[in-house]
Amino acid sequence: MSLDSPTFGCTDSPVRRERGQKAVFCGLTSIVWLHRKMQDAFFLVVGSRTCAHLLQAAAGVMIFAEPRFGTAVLEEQDLAGLADAHKELDREVAKLLERRPDIRQLFLVGSCPSEVLKLDLDRAAERLSGLHAPHVRVYSYTGSGLDTTFTQGEDTCLAAMVPTLDTTEAAELIVVGALPDVVEDQCLSLLTQLGVGPVRMLPARRSDIEPAVGPNTRFILAQPFLGETTGALERRGAKRIAAPFPFGEEGTTLWLKAVADAYGVSAEKFEAVTAAPRARAKKAIAAHLETLTGKSLFMFPDSQLEIPLARFLARECGMKTTEIATPFLHKAIMAPDLALLPSNTALTEGQDLEAQLDRHEAINPDLTVCGLGLANPLEAKGHATKWAIELVFTPVHFYEQAGDLAGLFSRPLRRRALLNGGAA
């Protein structure tokens, strides 16, 4: 073994915890992918015009396109306490449901303004569910930047749904976390070929096929930012299958192997099902290794995808992890990925932006993964950057996306090489 070969395992490594200035989206942005996933749902943000502009810009749609989300704007009289916000909300919901009879699930989404005003959206959801049952179920959750960052909006949304799921004694598997439809289909196909089932998804594409949960339910996370949802499912009696997350060939194989072992799938069958897609994934990743191998990596906290992605880049792409920061580090959920990270990786939970920027300058990494607000200033200083938001909005899970995932990181390095007059 080469002396340069890294050792692996960060399970017991020290974690720097920072609670300073942050540069990250609020949880409202998760509506952008959730409204596309849940085809009979509508997300009504109770917030300000700033919330409305954020969602419209993030989703890349105009409001006249009739997307499945909107904002109940808190006006000046609401902020001044001169209007009954709950009556106004009831009126807006009634108008919405009359105009959109296809809605079966309505989510009241809390924002910074509604949190400051202490609007009781839980009580409002309960009241509105009673008014509009059985046609529509109304939920509430928070996407406020005071409470959530970026992907945590999905976590609070799914956690709000779990208590309302039907109870079952059936031995079913739930795959938890929103995936693009094409990726979900690939996931279900692999599990079906392994003989695992029945398999349900949370969130489901429609409310009439949402999962039930009970003491014989097993679940596995497809997304790493679902700590609150995990707790809600476990309180309903479901048991979590622990696994690395399905990024890259190795991560996908270990994820599927954890499910296969839980369901008693033979090694021969597992090999027969996974051999061909594993080979395709390895070949697709290999096309990017010349660009990625040996390059240093620094990740600012953004989406909670950082640790499993760093594992993928270190082990499958040969990158050198320096500092890997994440908004929140749920050690129980991340344990399988932490065990596979290079042991010399510096782990950070949370953010103190100025201090982290100073460390970044001292390290001077080859590739920096960061939010939109940091990317342009860092590019101007000569750093190659990858927008972290692309890793959430691009299909990156499972075998068939492994090459695309590697390409997301190799492209900025090739671009920087071209700008510097080198070979691409």
From Swiss-Prot:
SUPFAM superfamilies membership: Helical backbone' metal receptor
Keywords: 4Fe-4S, ATP-binding, Bacteriochlorophyll biosynthesis, Chlorophyll biosynthesis, Iron, Iron-sulfur, Metal-binding, Nucleotide-binding, Oxidoreductase, Photosynthesis
Any one GO biological process: photosynthesis, dark reaction
The reaction(s) this protein catalyses: chlorophyllide a + oxidized 2[4Fe-4S]-[ferredoxin] + 2 ADP + 2 phosphate = protochlorophyllide a + reduced 2[4Fe-4S]-[ferredoxin] + 2 ATP + 2 H2O
Manner of cofactor binding, per the entry note: Binds 1 [4Fe-4S] cluster per heterodimer. The cluster is bound at the heterodimer interface by residues from both subunits.
One Gene Ontology molecular-function label: ATP binding
Binding residue positions for [4Fe-4S] cluster: C26, C51, C112
Cofactor: [4Fe-4S] cluster
EC number: 1.3.7.7
Annotated consequence of substituting C51A: Does not form heterotetramers
InterPro entries per UniProt: LIPOR_BchN/ChlN, Nase/OxRdtase_comp1, Protochl_reductN
Pathway: Porphyrin-containing compound metabolism; bacteriochlorophyll biosynthesis (light-independent)
Pfam families in alphabetical order: Oxidored_nitro
Assembly information from the UniProt record: Protochlorophyllide reductase is composed of three subunits; BchL, BchN and BchB. Forms a heterotetramer of two BchB and two BchN subunits.
Function: Component of the dark-operative protochlorophyllide reductase (DPOR) that uses Mg-ATP and reduced ferredoxin to reduce ring D of protochlorophyllide (Pchlide) to form chlorophyllide a (Chlide). This reaction is light-independent. The NB-protein (BchN-BchB) is the catalytic component of the complex.
Family: Belongs to the BchN/ChlN family.
PANTHER family assigned: LIGHT-INDEPENDENT PROTOCHLOROPHYLLIDE REDUCTASE SUBUNIT N
Protein name: Light-independent protochlorophyllide reductase subunit N
Originating species: Rhodobacter capsulatus (strain ATCC BAA-309 / NBRC 16581 / SB1003)
